[in-house]
């Protein structure tokens, strides 16, 4: 607000108060008995008009509005994916420029805007100060309007209105490919879909394992366990993408060479079905209904380098190694999430906040030690943990059974698949936990999830016997020009 205009406004208010004071005094005299010893003021007002010229308007504006909305409304307000949300942010920034002199030249992300407005340290100055500001605006500030300008707004607002709009991110709600998957089991505790680093998808259908090449769309049958009287309960690719592990209902783990279609070994040790597999270089971890986790090196003879991890009281249904290959997270039907390391046979961390089976587990590739987990039907929550300190971070109720979790390789986002009762796929932004997209199409629980090696597409499987491919994430392509590379002083950009 202009200081001269503010002074004139305050002067008018003071004059009006002084003009109305005699009337108030006369009314008090008529209502007060003559014998009353209390006398009313007759010359001085009873109000102090504060001068807000020295106040921090941005901080005051944030403090006034920070408690107006509920947390759910704040979460919806932060979701700026729609055009109406972006228009509202631009309009709010324009009002701040004209009324508060904020000097905003481009529309910021709502989360960034909240952090910018919120002071990092407590303000020592009061909200109302009774002194005039000594700061004077200089012509270089860009807030003064040119005398030749016909625009009713300031220069900063003009730059704000001329700033290009950030392109809206579009996530298709229709899968770009749908494949039939007959006999795909509708079992929450199994893991029957995995995508290799060589762009080959493995799917366990009944007693067989099929391989589908995303490059050629060719389908091959890797193995058939009907001869052995067994069925497939889990599949998992090695990091190199040349080996695939197959867990069976009888408790065996078979190692297959995908290119040659040859079984290399069969690992024993479990007494019940193997529903979870996790590779760590040449080591393979398997979780079973017998409540046991076995770690084995496939390069050594069977049972020679076996490690038995006992910590769950019911079936182990989720296994994931951290991105640095140092920690193993396991989830079970006992509602527990356990974290293991290489040197101990007992869990180094134990989380019991979930109220249902923990199958969905995912380690963040962007933040060291950040672990996400999801609970079953009775829990419906996605929880985040700092495994470096052992402390819980955040929690969000999704409203339905959490079946799978996967982090994006290119952005700080994650995707979750759900069962009862929504049967949907959700994309979340972290750490704000705002929904980026909601995908529907499966008629049964979305029990299976795998991500493509380039990190842009995902495949989901459900009991409706279909595999659906979605384009969810995209690689960030920088379009900024580095001025040092085109500088005249840079000799490497010129012909010598």
From Swiss-Prot:
Modification Phosphoserine occurs at: 36, 133, 138, 146, 151
GO terms of biological process kind: anaphase-promoting complex-dependent catabolic process; cell division; DNA repair; lens fiber cell differentiation; mitotic G2 DNA damage checkpoint signaling; negative regulation of cellular senescence; positive regulation of anaphase-promoting complex-dependent catabolic process; positive regulation of cell population proliferation
Disordered as annotated region, ranges: 28-51, 64-88, 105-166
Cystine pairs: none
Composition skew (Polar residues), residue ranges: 32-42, 146-160
Keywords per UniProt: Acetylation, Cell cycle, Cell division, Cytoplasm, Disease variant, DNA damage, DNA repair, Epilepsy, Intellectual disability, Mitosis, Nucleus, Phosphoprotein, Repeat, Ubl conjugation, Ubl conjugation pathway, WD repeat
InterPro entries xrefs: Cdc20/Fizzy, WD40/YVTN_repeat-like_dom_sf, WD40_CDC20-Fz, WD40_repeat_CS, WD40_repeat_dom_sf, WD40_rpt
UniProt biased composition (Basic and acidic residues): 76-86, 106-126
Positions where Phosphothreonine occurs in the chain: 32
CDD domains hit by this protein: WD40
Mutagenesis or variant effect for residue 47 to A: Inhibits APC/FZR1 E3 ubiquitin-protein ligase complex activity
Result of altering residue 151 to A: Constitutively active. Does not affect ubiquitination. Decreases ubiquitination. Decreases ubiquitination
Function as written in the Swiss-Prot or TrEMBL entry: Substrate-specific adapter for the anaphase promoting complex/cyclosome (APC/C) E3 ubiquitin-protein ligase complex. Associates with the APC/C in late mitosis, in replacement of CDC20, and activates the APC/C during anaphase and telophase. The APC/C remains active in degrading substrates to ensure that positive regulators of the cell cycle do not accumulate prematurely. At the G1/S transition FZR1 is phosphorylated, leading to its dissociation from the APC/C.
Protein family according to the UniProt entry: Belongs to the WD repeat CDC20/Fizzy family.
Subunit: The unphosphorylated form interacts with APC/C during mitosis. Interacts with NINL. Interacts (in complex with the anaphase promoting complex APC) with MAD2L2; inhibits FZR1-mediated APC/C activation. Interacts with SIRT2 and USP37. Interacts (via WD repeats) with MAK. Interacts with RBBP8/CtIP; this interaction leads to RBBP8 proteasomal degradation. Interacts with HECW2. Interacts with SASS6; the interaction is regulated by CENATAC and leads to SASS6 proteasomal degradation. Interacts (via N-terminus) with CCNF. Interacts with CDC6. Interacts with TK1 (via the KEN box).
The protein's name in its UniProt record: Fizzy-related protein homolog
Source organism of the structure: Homo sapiens (Human)
């Amino acid at each position: 607000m202009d200081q001269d205009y503010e002074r004139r406004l305050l002067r008018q208010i003071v004059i009006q108060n002084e003009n109305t004071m005699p009337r108030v005094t006369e009314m008090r005299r008529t209502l007060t008995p003559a014998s009353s010893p209390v006398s009313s003021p007759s010359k001085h007002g009873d109000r102090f008009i504060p001068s807000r010229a020295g106040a921090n308007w941005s901080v005051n504006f944030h403090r006034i509005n920070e408690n107006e909305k509920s947390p759910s409304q704040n979460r919806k307000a932060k979701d700026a994916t729609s055009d109406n949300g972006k228009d509202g942010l631009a309009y709010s920034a324009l009002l701040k420029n004209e009324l508060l002199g904020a000097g905003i030249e481009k529309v910021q992300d709502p989360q960034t805007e909240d952090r910018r407005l919120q002071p990092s340290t407590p303000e020592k100055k009061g909200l109302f100060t009774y002194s005039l500001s000594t700061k004077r605006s200089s012509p270089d500030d860009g807030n003064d309007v040119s005398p030749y300008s016909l625009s009713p707004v300031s220069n900063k607002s003009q730059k704000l209105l001329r700033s290009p709009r950030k392109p809206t991110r579009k996530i298709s709600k229709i899968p770009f490919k749908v494949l039939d998957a007959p006999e795909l089991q509708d079992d929450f505790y199994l893991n029957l879909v995995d995508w290799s680093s060589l762009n080959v998808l493995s799917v366990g259908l009944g007693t067989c394992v099929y391989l589908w090449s995303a490059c050629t769309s060719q389908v091959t049958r890797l193995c058939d366990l009907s001869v052995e009287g067994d069925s497939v309960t889990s599949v998992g690719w090695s990091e190199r993408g040349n080996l695939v592990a197959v867990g069976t209902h009888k408790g065996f783990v078979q190692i297959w060479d995908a290119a040659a279609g040859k079984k290399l070994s069969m690992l024993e040790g479990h007494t019940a079905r193997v529903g979870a597999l996790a590779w760590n270089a040449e080591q393979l971890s398997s979780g079973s209904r017998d409540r046991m986790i076995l770690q084995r090196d496939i390069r050594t003879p069977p049972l020679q380098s076996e490690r038995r991890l006992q910590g769950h009281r019911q079936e182990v249904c989720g296994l994931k190694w951290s991105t640095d290959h140092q920690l193993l997270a396991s989830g079970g039907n006992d509602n527990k999430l356990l974290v293991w390391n290489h040197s101990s046979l007992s869990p180094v961390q134990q989380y019991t906040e979930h109220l249902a089976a923990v199958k969905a587990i995912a380690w963040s590739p962007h933040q060291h030690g950040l672990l996400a987990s999801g609970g079953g039907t009775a829990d419906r929550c996605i929880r985040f943990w700092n495994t470096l300190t052992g402390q819980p971070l955040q929690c969000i109720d999704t409203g339905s059974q959490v079946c799978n979790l996967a982090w994006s390789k290119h952005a700080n986002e994650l995707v979750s698949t759900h069962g009862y009762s929504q049967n949907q796929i959700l994309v979340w932004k972290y750490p704000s936990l705002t929904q980026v997209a909601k995908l529907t199409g499966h008629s049964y629980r979305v029990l299976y999830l795998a991500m493509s090696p380039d990190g842009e597409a995902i495949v989901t499987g459900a009991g409706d016997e279909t595999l659906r491919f979605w384009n969810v994430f995209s690689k960030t392509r920088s379009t900024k020009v580095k001025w040092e590379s085109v500088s005249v002083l840079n000799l490497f950009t010129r012909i010598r």
